[in-house]
């Protein structure tokens, strides 16, 4: 179609004269227009044929670019570079992410310790060289799947292993730091609280029992911690150094603000050693001059006293208070008994005991003769006055006499004797009818006019 330049009427391309105004069209313009339209149509056909090829070429370029991008971030060499850069730049968070596994979460503080350990025990330059060589060998090998980087002393510090592929083309390398177990062995039941793997952790260790506190990657650690015992709460650190371990465990050194108490007693020579006690903060314990008591927190006062027995009576020292400001890691204290008071009491009791022993010697000398006479004559009346009527011992001896099973005794010796009210306990050494020496414990009752009678007996 074309338009009349004079009146604007639309007409077919092959019409020579406008049907409305009679204007005569130029035949050369129509021919030119027809030629131009044909050229455009031809060019359009050519363009449509080229588009698929252009799209295909563009996609190919994109694939090539994508491959190189993936290679830059996912090839074994790229994975190695990421770890190396993180260690070189002390990027503890990145190192923690790279080393963490499902079974062992590594936090940023552990990673920081690990980075320093690598730089100190391997050397950064050597570590980078060893790591690149190891990755290269694993990547080329058809059989090897894992290898270790080691410290100068031969400790395994990093495990490098193949772990499948990435995006079909690239071997996936895994970097894992070996772990060991730090162990504690407290003198008494202890609760430890600290942070591990980014989380708060609590470990309860029984007295004198080896207890692991977790799994840690190699490093030299000084972990802030709290510990609690029956003696109180302590703030400080758990310290352990993997350079000092050739096994799967490493000993923990405790560094807490604590005081240990050494006690010296004076004026205690007359006290029974087994009866001596020390009371610290209301907790009573057996005394030993070679023992160290504690530990106790250094931020709280400590009260301490001692006690002991002599001739059945308990004696105590004055209670002393050690101020927190005076507490040291090793603190010595002396506690004094009133030696004159103890000696006076012991002297008095010894006089009483000597008097009692003399009475008992006389009693058992008569009893042994009466016992033997009752045996020889089969007559309980010989011995009945020495035994309290109605007691189980009275009935037992009477039965033995009637059956002829009463034992002969001789040479009684008083080994020990104590009196409590009207009751007396005595340890007596005898020789039986077989000629054997035996120790027997007797209980007696002191009646009117200081008359003694046996109540019961047993062999010691």
Swiss-Prot record:
GO-annotated molecular function: zinc ion binding
Source taxon at top rank: Bacteria
Location(s) in or outside the cell: Cell membrane; Membrane raft
Pfam family, one: TcaA_3rd_4th
Extracellular topological domain residue ranges: 71-460
One Gene Ontology cellular component annotation held by this UniProt entry: membrane raft
UniProt keyword terms in alphabetical order: Antibiotic resistance, Cell membrane, Membrane, Metal-binding, Transmembrane, Transmembrane helix, Zinc, Zinc-finger
Residue intervals passing through the bilayer: 50-70
Induction behaviour: Transcriptionally regulated by the vraSR two-component system in response to cell wall antibiotics, such as teicoplanin, vancomycin, and oxacillin.
Topology term for the membrane: Single-pass membrane protein
Residues in C4-type zinc fingers: 4-21
GO biological process annotation, one example: response to antibiotic
Cytoplasmic topological segments: 1-49
Coiled-coil stretches noted in the UniProt entry, renumbered to this chain: none
Family per similarity comment: Belongs to the TcaA family.
Function: Plays a major role in decreasing resistance to glycopeptide antibiotics.
Name used for this protein in its record: Membrane-associated protein TcaA
């Amino acid at each position: 179609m074309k338009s009349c330049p004079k009146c604007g009427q639309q007409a077919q391309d092959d019409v020579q004269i406008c049907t409305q105004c009679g204007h005569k069209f130029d035949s050369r313009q129509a021919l030119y227009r027809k030629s131009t339209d044909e050229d455009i149509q031809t060019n359009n056909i050519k363009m449509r044929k080229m588009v698929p090829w252009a799209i295909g070429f563009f996609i190919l370029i994109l694939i090539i670019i994508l491959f190189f991008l993936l290679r830059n971030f996912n090839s074994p060499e790229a994975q190695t570079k990421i770890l190396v850069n993180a260690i070189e730049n002390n990027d503890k968070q990145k190192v923690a992410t790279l080393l963490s596994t499902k079974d062992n979460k590594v936090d940023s503080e552990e990673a920081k310790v690990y980075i320093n350990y690598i730089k100190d025990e391997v050397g950064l330059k050597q570590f980078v060289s060893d790591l690149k060589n190891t990755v290269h060998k694993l990547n080329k090998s058809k059989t090897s799947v894992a290898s270790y980087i080691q410290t100068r002393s031969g400790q395994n510090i990093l495990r490098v292993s193949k772990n499948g592929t990435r995006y079909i083309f690239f071997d996936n390398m895994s970097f894992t730091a070996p772990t060991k177990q730090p162990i504690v062995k407290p003198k008494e039941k202890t609760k430890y609280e600290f942070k591990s793997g980014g989380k708060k952790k609590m470990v309860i260790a029984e007295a004198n029992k080896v207890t692991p506190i977790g799994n840690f990657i190699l490093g030299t650690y000084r972990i802030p911690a709290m510990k609690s015992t029956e003696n109180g709460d302590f703030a400080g650190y758990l310290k352990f150094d993997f350079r000092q371990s050739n096994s799967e465990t490493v000993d923990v050194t405790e560094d807490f603000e604590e005081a240990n108490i050494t006690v010296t007693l004076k004026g205690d020579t007359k006290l029974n050693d087994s009866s001596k006690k020390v009371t610290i903060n209301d907790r009573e314990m057996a005394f030993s001059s070679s023992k160290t008591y504690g530990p106790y927190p250094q931020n709280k006062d400590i009260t301490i006293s001692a006690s002991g027995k002599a001739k059945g009576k308990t004696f105590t020292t004055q209670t002393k208070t050690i101020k927190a400001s005076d507490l040291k890691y090793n603190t010595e204290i002396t506690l004094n008994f009133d030696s004159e008071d103890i000696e006076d009491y012991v002297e008095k009791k010894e006089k009483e005991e000597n008097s009692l022993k003399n009475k008992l010697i006389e009693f058992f000398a008569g009893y042994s003769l009466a016992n033997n006479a009752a045996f020889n004559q089969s007559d309980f009346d010989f011995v009945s006055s020495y035994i309290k009527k109605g007691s189980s011992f009275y009935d037992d001896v009477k039965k033995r006499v009637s059956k002829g099973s009463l034992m002969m005794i001789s040479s009684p010796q008083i080994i020990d004797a104590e009196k409590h009210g009207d009751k007396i306990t005595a340890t007596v050494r005898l020789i039986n009818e077989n000629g054997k020496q035996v120790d027997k414990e007797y209980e007696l009752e002191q009646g009117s006019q200081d008359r003694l009678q046996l109540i019961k007996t047993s062999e010691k």
